[in-house]
Amino acid sequence: MNAIPSASSVQTVHVPLGERAYDILIGPGLIARAGAEIASRLKGRKAAVVTDENVAPLYLQALVASLDEAGIASAAVVLPAGEKTKSFEHLMTACDKVLEARVERNDCVIALGGGVIGDLSGFAAGIVRRGVRFVQVPTSLLAQVDSSVGGKTGINSRHGKNLIGVFHQPDLVLADTDVLNTLSEREFRAGYAEVAKYGLIDKPDFFAWLEANWKAVFTGGAARIEAIAASCQAKADVVVADERENGPRALLNLGHTFGHALETATAYDSSRLVHGEGVSIGMVLAHEFSARMNLASPDDARRVERHLQEVGLPTRMSDIPGALPPAETLMDAIAQDKKVKSGKLTFILTRGIGQSFVADDVPASEVISFLREKHP
């Protein structure tokens, strides 16, 4: 890990994707600078700001004021908060409002919110007028380190999570770390699961750094900025190597195959399970399943579980409130996973901490047996 920078600094992570290249700015005070940063990069002078009922009272006024100061006229679209907003109904509401605001191709849609708002707004930006400019202003840790970067957008289906969507890269990401101070402890912990994921994929030194410094990351300041920047750089590196998820980008789904199945099983009820919590449980399950398949040591799974438990994240299916459906139902959700190819199951498994890999054609019989063991 690099030395921790001063708390007042803003870090920039560049995502070099040719004509779709963009910057991720990370640090305090970026919402106040949003108008100037957008105006310096985009030609259009109109914006539709998509946000939710929780975020709007906190940050919408400040963002609109910043846009006004930069000469960018804006209209706001305020949607309900929560995972269930990722639906066709709310997507069409957003699209209609963007069109009502007469946003043209050189203008932009701005996502002001967490992963739900970012995913839905990006989908709207990708399909309105066959594509308008898009800016992410993520307000959750999970969105800052994961969903705002990389161009994946989408909504959920009754068949599973994120199954309907497009790739539409943002033109700019403004990760204002000040906004994280208003997150609940549960929301911050959920985002931290995605931070830990990058260490578990291929950066064992980063995972070890997190084990030693997680309390400082939770406290805020320089360690938090460093963790977010390292996470964004890790994701940017993978996205540049495989923008359309035809190969190594699938590694970013570590923990997500099991996690998405659990989210589907709980009907996206955030009172029971939020995305980062599903990823936390999923990462432990992925390491345990790898050990079961004699790919990794059980000690690695125990180490992952120990750290995630230490920060207060759920690590077992039994940690989810309420009853879960049987293993066979979970298996049905896994079979709908986006990584399935020609009906064959694909998982992100591991040979050790920071040694994740794409495992094709995983035997369904092994998975169902494992699920029955973990959820009898």
Swiss-Prot record:
Cofactor(s) listed in the protein's UniProt record: Co(2+); Zn(2+); NAD(+)
UniProt binding sites for Zn(2+): E194, H256, H275
One GO location term (cellular component): cytoplasm
Q: How is the cofactor bound?
A: Binds 1 divalent metal cation per subunit. Can use either Co(2+) or Zn(2+).
Provide the binding site for NAD(+): G115, V116, I117, G118, D119, T139, S140, K152, K161
Q: Which InterPro entries match?
A: Dehydroquinate_synthase (IPR050071), DHQ_synth_AroB (IPR016037), DHQ_synth_fam (IPR030963), DHQS/DOIS_N (IPR030960), DHQS_C (IPR056179)
GO MF term list: 3-dehydroquinate synthase activity; metal ion binding; nucleotide binding
Q: Where in the cell is it found?
A: Cytoplasm
One Gene Ontology term of the biological-process aspect is: aromatic amino acid family biosynthetic process
Concerning Gene3D superfamilies, the annotation shows:
3.40.50.1970, Dehydroquinate synthase-like - alpha domain
Q: What is its main location?
A: cytoplasm
| Catalytic reactions of this protein | 7-phospho-2-dehydro-3-deoxy-D-arabino-heptonate = 3-dehydroquinate + phosphate
Q: Pathway of this protein?
A: Metabolic intermediate biosynthesis; chorismate biosynthesis; chorismate from D-erythrose 4-phosphate and phosphoenolpyruvate: step 2/7
The alphabetized UniProt keywords are:
Amino-acid biosynthesis, Aromatic amino acid biosynthesis, Cobalt, Cytoplasm, Lyase, Metal-binding, NAD, Nucleotide-binding, Zinc
Q: What is its EC number?
A: 4.2.3.4
UniProt lists the family membership as follows: Belongs to the sugar phosphate cyclases superfamily. Dehydroquinate synthase family.
What is the stated purpose of this protein? Catalyzes the conversion of 3-deoxy-D-arabino-heptulosonate 7-phosphate (DAHP) to dehydroquinate (DHQ).
What PANTHER family has UniProt attached to this entry? 3-DEHYDROQUINATE SYNTHASE, 3-DEHYDROQUINATE SYNTHASE, CHLOROPLASTIC
Q: Which named protein is this?
A: 3-dehydroquinate synthase
Protein's gene: aroB
